[in-house]
Amino acid sequence: MPQSIVEPRRIVLALLATLLAPTGAMSQALPFQAPGDSRLRHMVELDADDDRTPLTTTWPLPSADLRSDERDTMRGYNQPGSATDAGWFLSGAAKPTRLRTFSDTPREKGEAGLQAGWAAGDYAGGAIRLSYAFSPQDGMHYRLDGTYLAWRVGNWWLTAGVQDRWWGPGWDGSLILSNNARPMPGLGLERNSSVPFQSKLLRWLGPWRLVTFVDHMENHRADFNNTLFWGARFSFKPANSLEFGLSRTAEFCGKGRPCGLGTVWDMLTARSNRKYNANSTPGQNLVKQSAQVWAGDVRWHPGDLPVALYWQELGEVFDDRNLRPRQLLQLFGVEFASRYVASGRLRAFLEFADTACGAIGLSPGDKPNFGCAYEKDTWRAGYRFRGRVIGDSMDRDGRRLTLGAIYAYAPARSWELRLRRFDLNRGNIAQAGLVPQTVTTVAERIWNAELKVDGPIGDFRYSIGVGADHGGPLGTPAKWDGRAFLTVSRDWAQAP
């Protein structure tokens, strides 16, 4: 039987055995809150700006960082959030968007499945999601996306599963790691509670969190099968108003590639970013044995003002002899959050992102290097997984300006609106490596509007969204294009 089928079946059997084991947890929050619920994130950041939640730019978010009286109530609904959650979900979409945001919108035309949460005290827990995708873009019908198990050892969680991640302060995109691509199966180590160091030497860092993981990429890739994907992020908050994040990711190993301790050491120390492939053809440019990126970000909420500024930068090139990141991608944003507007809470944001290397520089002579971002020398399938880029959903050479708003009111109800302008694939490069640009192979300009509404109806939860695009390839007449989606779920614990 193919390895790609055997491994998921083993995972499913192990998870089912764990979920069916007797426990004393009845309404306990799970170890993590998954990314994808903008309403939840909006409420969490309101608490963070009041200094009641420590860190908010690294998702999944540990439930231990939520206030103790909110852990069972302030949670997302797109995936299981507590030990009593169990039910089914169904989604359908007409023309699923290729330009995903933090919000969990359907990637496929249709998907149906079962999900449940599980917890054993505060030392173990997880979620299981089994689904079937209709007409999947990557050909994978059966899925475990969102499934994980976690075991706590001291103040650390050991995790195994298929978890979505979002690193950075952006609402519309993350340059280094977003939920645009499907999650990969892997193992991780994450800090549980972001309590500060006790030592005087490091206490100034304030609340801090460390996350690291190793995931398994596709069994069959255009470059090297069974490549591994490593990520690490350190975030800290030295002042109540200021949160920093430092992130690294790398592709390594894979069929036909070295994968010993030396390879791992070179990756961790960034030596592999300056070592060249010994098999490079003489007379041609040497090919670096690297597939690493670095990102830094900051979110600043000045005093009691209802405003926050944020920034993220990704460097495509760096190494152990020159740690200064080069070939930079940039994301900037400003957000305004009100306490109460007509009995609800409003957050508005303006965000700009550019995914062309060096497009935004300090020198007047700086010019964008098209065909650079998310492309790699040796791993020439690039920074992508199952047909989608792992970072910002625009893929390389994009530019986006977004005006967005989130309005949360009543229990678990919210509206979300986005107005966006895209300049996609500005270099008009269809294919820089082994894989084409995943959004468009030609330069396009698109104006976009999207509306999303979430809430409960009786025992059911729904999320409904509509969107419209106006534009198309440069030099051609602009056209209108529409899309819509509906997601419905029901929690058996709430059923009569």
Pin down the residues of each PLM region.
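Well-ordered mid-protein domain cores that form the structural environment of catalytic cofactors
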Residues: 107-204
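Transmembrane beta-strand segments that form the barrel wall of outer-membrane beta-barrel proteins
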Residues: 86-104, 124-136, 158-166, 170-174, ...
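Outer-membrane beta-barrel domain signature
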Residues: 33, 55-56, 99-105, 115, ...
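N-terminal periplasmic/intermembrane-space "pro-region" immediately following the signal or transit peptide
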Residues: 15, 26-104
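Signature for the C-terminal beta-barrel architecture of outer-membrane proteins
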Residues: 166, 186-380, 396-403, 408, ...
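Short loop/turn motifs that connect adjacent beta-strands in outer-membrane beta-barrel proteins
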Residues: 55-57, 78-87, 119-126, 152-155, ...
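Outer-membrane beta-barrel "beta-signal"
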Residues: 186-189, 234, 455-457, 479-496
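N-terminal signal peptide c-region/cleavage motif recognized by signal peptidases
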Residues: 22-24
